[in-house]
Amino acid sequence: MAVLTDDQVDAALPELGGWERADGALRRSVKFPAFLDGIEAVRRVAERAEAKDHHPDIDIRWRTVTFVLVTHSEGGITEKDLQMAREIDEILDR
């Protein structure tokens, strides 16, 4: 799978809710009403990631959860990352 150019990633960002390109990865931070709401969202994302065999880096800070996507085996952002970002958006926006 080919690494996307910065222009390709930037063109996809408007359709992704709250994602940004930072340090060679896609990143989205979400603030939840309560700590356990964030943990539940992480659980749902983890289930989908496991099913797709494409796992985001996840950072949990009290009520804020940050998801980071990059295809490590390819050394950059690929279409797999864009697709997983869409799926994370779908899970979080339910």
Swiss-Prot record:
Q: An example of a Gene Ontology BP annotation on this entry?
A: tetrahydrobiopterin biosynthetic process
GO-annotated molecular function: 4-alpha-hydroxytetrahydrobiopterin dehydratase activity
- InterPro entries xrefs: PCD_sf, Pterin_deHydtase
CDD domains the record matches: PCD_DCoH (cd00488)
Q: Which Gene3D superfamilies match?
A: Transcriptional coactivator/pterin dehydratase
Which catalytic reaction applies to this protein?
Answer: (4aS,6R)-4a-hydroxy-L-erythro-5,6,7,8-tetrahydrobiopterin = (6R)-L-erythro-6,7-dihydrobiopterin + H2O
- For this protein, what is the EC number? 4.2.1.96
Name of this protein: Putative pterin-4-alpha-carbinolamine dehydratase
